[in-house]
Amino acid sequence: MASVFKIHSAYQPAGDQVKAIQNIADSFQKGEKKVTLVGVTGSGKTFTMAQVIQNLGLPTLVLSHNKTLAAQLFREFKEFFPENAVEYFVSYYDYYQPEAYVPSSDTFIEKDSSINEEIDKLRLRATSSLLEREDVVIVSSVSCIYGLGSPEEYTNSVVALKVGDTIERDTVIRKLLHIQYNRNDLDFSRGNFRVRGDSIEIYPAYHTDGIRIEFFGDEIDSISRINPVTAQTIFKLEKAYIYPAKHFITSGPKVKEAVENIRAEVDAQTDFFRKNNKLLEAERILSRTNYDMEMLQEMGYCNGIENYSRHLTGRKPGERPACLIDYFQGEFLLIVDESHVTIPQIGGMFAGDRARKQTLVDFGFRLPSALDNRPLNFQEFETLTPRTLYVSATPAEYEIEKSSKVVEQIIRPTGLLDPIVDVRPTKNQIEDLLVEIRKRIDAGERVLVTTLTKKMSEDLTDYYEEIGLKVAYLHSEVETLDRVGIIRDLRKGIYDVLIGINLLREGLDIPEVSLVAILDADKEGFLRNYKSLIQTIGRAARNVNGTAILYADKTTDSMAKAIEETKRRRKIQEDHNLKFGITPLTIKKEVGDIIEREEKERTSEDLVLEDVEKKFNSKKFPNKEVLKEKLREEMMKAAKELDFERAAILRDKMLSIQTEDSSAKN
């Protein structure tokens, strides 16, 4: 039977990929539940994953341990499966301060957050795709184990409309309001709808196009997909399914029942506090909960509504909440990327969440039922994901022990060797590194530098900036979409050097990087253990000139083991290349936005950039010297007119051309 997935790629499986794909697919088809793929950096693990997905033909959840790598995988899978639904599901918070109480200082910290609308749209699109089709690949962070609205409520709330259906216009309006759409006849934006005579125009919360429903009396006369900006018809539809604008949907009767149960719980908790002479806590929980219940009854919503999710969804005490995994219908495949990091992260989520909320419960800020608004614990996660492929260059003991088969993928189809590892003393490491960076810049290549502390990263970035290097600092406070933008800018040559702490290890795919520098490599610990060193060294394995410099005054056991393993893998690849006459080549990969941003959400900078690309390109100016001069003139003109944003973009364009020239010369 033909697979519902179809890979689009100019390449065929090669090297160890052929055997790995066959072994993994055969294992799952025989009924085996857990398999581990041990694949070195640059061996094409993502391509192997895609081939396994195509062979099995199952909906797939790809789990990554951070948003940056999830975004990279999302882009790669979209390229492999352009005809299928590839979706992205990560936390939609740009900023999140959870509710907390610090007893030692009697400080209550209110929840504060900022939601990224683009990621919210992608999350909603992910769940709608799971309910609509079978050919779905969802790339997710650990957000997939956190509470989400019930899939049953979500499915039951879908508004199904078909040409020829008899239904009153006002009934459709009421249904849209129930699934959290807002009527706004002036602002036609995501999650809103407007009414124009005998038609309703809806802007789905998960889509880039709008939908127009036209009525003739009480009958649906036509349904169209429309451009939300111009309102012009794109094409006609026979039917349309409008999915809720929010994941948390609750019917009126359930709210009434939930309020009764919450009031019963608050009475019991108040009695408990009073019996234990905790009068302040008793008054606190009573007043806070009463206020929330009034809001819930009047508005259907209250701040911190997620803390009442157990009652609103009718779950029993201790019962796990619904999550993204529950939206998969029937059999599916879970792929855990960089499993040696992702698996421990899943295990740690529950304990951290529980500790914070227990304090809130103990001091009367939340009811005990708030503890059930939580991520899955590890046992629940294992139960929900029976068919799992673990993928890592350095799998942990857990993955190896759980797997019925461990498949190695050492040989790279490109012939690329593992990087040369050079150990140097820490004395004058910054100046020594500067010399190496300049060599790479002259060759048109890029550099990653990893430090031990945030302060050292910041100081090093400032120092290199002062002496004229194009350098960026990648850290945890950079927003998700900006983080992937920095990586794109490094690849394009806007930056030559990227400095970070622990964000430069697993999975970062930058073929232009020929040097990875690890400062203080002999400081044994989480960031300098064997697995971390192997992963960091591997960042230079996608370039034919790949080198890793470890600055250290002694060789630790972790360093010795990592260097030995790198040499072993290098020898295997060298022998393969010699046997088949393969010449190593740097991976060629198109530079593009990892996550496409929508037309309406482009910033002024995007528009200026588009204008510059349109007016100043190699087609209009084939001679690069003429193009650079035109860019310089336009840059000076923009600066004179105080349009510094345009001037900066023109400067970056000019620098990018200069970088291309120096690369070509070398």
UniProtKB/Swiss-Prot annotation:
Residues 429-591 form the Helicase C-terminal domain. GO terms for molecular function: ATP binding; ATP hydrolysis activity; DNA binding; excinuclease ABC activity. PROSITE patterns: HELICASE_ATP_BIND_1, HELICASE_CTER, UVR. A motif (Beta-hairpin) lies at residues 92-115. GO terms for cellular component: cytoplasm; excinuclease repair complex. Forms a heterotetramer with UvrA during the search for lesions. Interacts with UvrC in an incision complex. Belongs to the UvrB family. This is UvrABC system protein B. It comes from Leptospira interrogans serogroup Icterohaemorrhagiae serovar Lai (strain 56601).
